[in-house]
Amino acid sequence: YFSYNDKIIKILEAEYLNADHHFTSGTVISDKLEIACGSGILRVKKLQQESKKALNIEEFLCGTNILKDTVLK
């Protein structure tokens, strides 16, 4: 999970990409919500915002804009 705009967002489904990068862990590196992690990239596929129903990434991004280069915690 991560926090964004003071809301907890659970990652329900994701794909790990074994790829080298130079980003800080937690950095959003694409507009498709790919997140840099220690030794690769996490491509989020399904998530659930606090007190909301689960959504696939396309549905989520229609209503929530998490900008590239945002560092998630």
Curated annotation (Swiss-Prot):
Its EC number is 2.1.2.9. It is an enzyme of class 2 (transferase). GO terms for molecular function: methionyl-tRNA formyltransferase activity. The keyword Isomerase does not apply. The keyword Transferase applies. Keywords: Protein biosynthesis, Transferase. It catalyses: L-methionyl-tRNA(fMet) + (6R)-10-formyltetrahydrofolate = N-formyl-L-methionyl-tRNA(fMet) + (6S)-5,6,7,8-tetrahydrofolate + H(+). InterPro entries: Formyl_trans_C (IPR005793), Formyl_trans_C_sf (IPR037022), Formyl_transferase-like_C_sf (IPR011034), Met-tRNA-FMT_C (IPR044135). Belongs to the Fmt family. Attaches a formyl group to the free amino group of methionyl-tRNA(fMet). The formyl group appears to play a dual role in the initiator identity of N-formylmethionyl-tRNA by promoting its recognition by IF2 and preventing the misappropriation of this tRNA by the elongation apparatus. This is Methionyl-tRNA formyltransferase. It comes from Rickettsia rhipicephali. The gene is fmt.
